[in-house]
Amino acid sequence: MSTIIDVYAREVLDSRGNPTVEVEVYTESGAFGRAIVPSGASTGEHEAVELRDGDKSRYLGKGVMNAVNNVNEAIAPEIVGFDVTDQAGIDRAMIELDGTPNKGKLGANAILGVSMAVAHAAADFVGLPLYRYLGGFNAKQLPTPMMNIINGGSHADNNVDFQEFMILPVGAPTFKESIRMGAEVFHALKAVLHDKGLNTAVGDEGGFAPNLGSNREALEVIIEAIEKAGYKAGENVFLGMDVASSEFYNKETGKYDLAGEGRTGLTSAEMVDFYEELCKDFPIISIEDGLDENDWDGHKLLTERIGDKVQLVGDDLFVTNTQKLAEGIEKGISNSILIKVNQIGTLTETFEAIEMAKRAGYTAVVSHRSGETEDATIADIAVATNAGQIKTGSMSRTDRIAKYNQLLRIEDELGEIAVYDGIKSFYNIKR
């Protein structure tokens, strides 16, 4: 047993230059843990509350000193004296201290920072890497990376409606080789865009952010890059999209407006038709948030039409929340959940969501946020839970590469027992 003797939070910066919460946990044994909380740009309305100060004279209102003070003045006195390995007990104590259904009193960013830092300190105490401490002896599966190489929507200042266009190097024999394949396609895409006279600046998640004629054109240039890198689309490398359709859903009309394509007033059925057409023309294996988070009828139709052959990921739809996920499972909506630790606010609840998804035959994709830091906790979570997939950005920006590098270290440490399933990680669709 190692008792927590101090918890301290401070305000630091994320990859967008916005403040976020960093937490440190100290124990009587000398074990120590530190974690930094990520932040999203396109957020679901049902997510746990990220507490911002709202003081426009400081960081344009985005300061997090209220959350920092909640850690130092409210949470710290509550959990000092706890055994650092009592993760569930500590998380439960913070949830009860907050007392709201969405962590709106203390802030999910305050609670999560402590939850993750506690896990790091506990792993340090028992002398295990974080993935092994959290996942036990069976933690050995490296995730298939979903690499966001073209950014649009809320993640870029361009005219592309869909938020992310991803490559999935499912044909690689190991995680290390999947990273190599992804990097080669990324560099090939830069050359393709350059040759077309298009911008090669990158967006929030490290992908290129050119102005393109349509969402279809984004897929076309990625196919060209895959082939230029010497791979076969639909064999070595598949495509994925995070549509983030809530960002262009018109609540007043109940329709979808693809402004970048000049197509407005699309119904849910017309959006489903569009996705089905794209999936016939391109090797798309995963679509995230294809309809608005509250358009459950649209999600149901999409699942019925292509859910047997395409992974349909619920992000804003489920917000890493077991109640939302249970409802989706009961109604047969989507077949996968995106896992974002700050959507729910504790590691315990995060692990519960992953477990529920797997029991129901849904896949689970561990994910970063657009506002990230050097913290690589999600890499360890992906291996600890044998999630099978991770979405953590492109092949540029250190805040993204930090997660890939941590996974490379883990694979190296696991040695011969490391598993990389590639295409088999999409176990609930026909491929």
Curated annotation (Swiss-Prot):
Cofactor note: Binds a second Mg(2+) ion via substrate during catalysis.
GO biological process terms, semicolon-separated: glycolytic process
Pathway where this protein functions: Carbohydrate degradation; glycolysis; pyruvate from D-glyceraldehyde 3-phosphate: step 4/5
Organism of derivation: Bacillus anthracis
E.C. number: 4.2.1.11
Annotated binding of Mg(2+), by residue: 242, 288, 315
Record's keyword annotation contains Cytoplasm: yes
Source domain of life: Bacteria
Subcellular location: Cytoplasm; Secreted; Cell surface
Family: Belongs to the enolase family.
InterPro entries recorded: Enolase, Enolase-like_C_sf, Enolase-like_N, Enolase_C, Enolase_CS, Enolase_N
EC class name: lyase
Name this polypeptide is given: Enolase
